[in-house]
Every structure is written in C-alpha cells, then in structure tokens.
Amino acid sequence: EKKDNEDYHFTTDMTDEAIKWVEFQHAMTPDKPFMLYFATGAVHAPHHAPKEWIEKYKGQFDDGWDALREKTLARQKEMGIVPENTVLAPKPDDIPNWDDLTDNEKKLFALQMEAFAGFAEHTDNEVGRLVEAIAEMGELDNTLFIYIMGDNVSSAECGLI
C-alpha cells in the first residue's frame, strides 16, 4: 500500500522503520545497548527525491560545474576550511568545460545536479529524524553515530551520461 502512494519515498520508509525498531528495542530492553546499521540508497543512482526537495535547488546550478568549483573553493577559504593560498585542483580531463556544452546538455546536467543535491539533503533530513527519535528516548548522549556518505566514484554510473 505504501508503494502505491505517489508521495512514497524509500528513504523515508527506511527511516520510519528504523525509528520503530529502535523504539521497540528500547521499550523491550531499556538496559541493553542496540546496534542499527542504517544504509540508505543515497546518493546512488537513480538520483531521486521528493519533488519539493529537488525544487529547492531549481536554478542553483545553472552557472555550471566550473563556476560551482570556483565558488566552493572561495567559500572554503572564507570559512577557514582550506588555507588562503589553496588553488583549485585540476578538473579531470573527461569532464568538459561547462561553456563547451550545448544548451540542452547544460539544462540536463543542471537538472541532474539539482536532483543530486535534493536527494542528499532529503537523506540528511531523514538521518536527522532518526537522531531526533533517539534523543527523544533519552539515549542520544549514550549513542555512537558513525555517519558515512561517499560519492561512490567507482560505480558503473560514473561519467556524464
């Protein structure tokens, strides 16, 4: 029945089930530790998220990946994450300059970046719901979180298309 709902999203469903499981474990054996391995599909292809999460990023990548790389480095310098004299790393040869793409390619790749960003933020929000549930149980200070998110650069879907 859930999957027939047009608003269904697997990450949200996983989070709901994880919260139920943690709450059940805590209710049944409050003095025992629990272990939960919570591995979402994000941000592996296909990149999908609820529409409102993708729409938040509408137009934010229209300047392309070259401009985004420069803005990201500038922001990292401003925040003190990297030294002021840090230079932009070379871009891989198989990634073309944004300005060399056709208008249709730019539109497609900007949309893909919007979907990726929306998917990543939606997943982060769902992890936050799980953390909140553990906090409401009074177990947050007694819980170790190991939060790993990788770009999975070696997966088959790498490349532009």
Residue locations for each model-derived region?
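Active-site-proximal cap/lid insertion segments
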Residues: 1-161
